[in-house]
Amino acid sequence: MTIIGQVEGHYILPAENKTTKYEHIIPALIAIEQDRSIEGLMILLNTVGGDVEAGLAIAEMIAGMQTPTVSLVLGGGHSIGVPLAVSAKRSFIVPSATMTIHPVRTNGLVVGVPQTFAYFNQIQNRIIEFITRCSHIQTERLLSFMHRTDALATDIGSILTGEEAVAEGLIDQLGSLQDAISCLYELIEAAPLRYTDASVPSSTLGKDGCSGTNGKIKTKEKSHPQE
């Protein structure tokens, strides 16, 4: 599955924009989760971000899947693409890719009252909670990247390279397509059969992730249902 361009929300973007539509992705994820012939899912990301509600909805869907999932950031996983990247059971990023972390913002006319900014802060807290729940980065560290003023010329935030994203615990592993595919096969082999009796034991490897992770193991027992 590919998540590319801009994540489209409740408004249709101009025809010249490459978009990922949540009304297409969400039903596809449900079908994948229910199809017993599908053993695993790889998510390829090259996105500039987009609508917060739509992106977070897709990320929560992926995080709540029992199907083994692996994400691979190619090119960029910016803005709301960060939660999408970390939502899989195992996340990879290629060395040349980058990830942009910045505060929540909006375009157009807004009401200049404290309640508006409190609402933006509430949305931002939801995103931060999801990222820290599904990765190893600490909340304080994530906020420090989000509020940097010396990294972007006309904006607030940070751009992390692939190596930096892994070093900070945002992404699990630096790797290529082959690395991501190999990891997905490992997760598939280690995973218990889906839709079976709950007494079937779960493999240790399936819980801990893939081998060759230099100690950066993410345990994700998913029970949870424009930046």
Predicted stretch roles:
Residues 1-82, 87-102, 106-227:
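N-terminal organellar transit peptides
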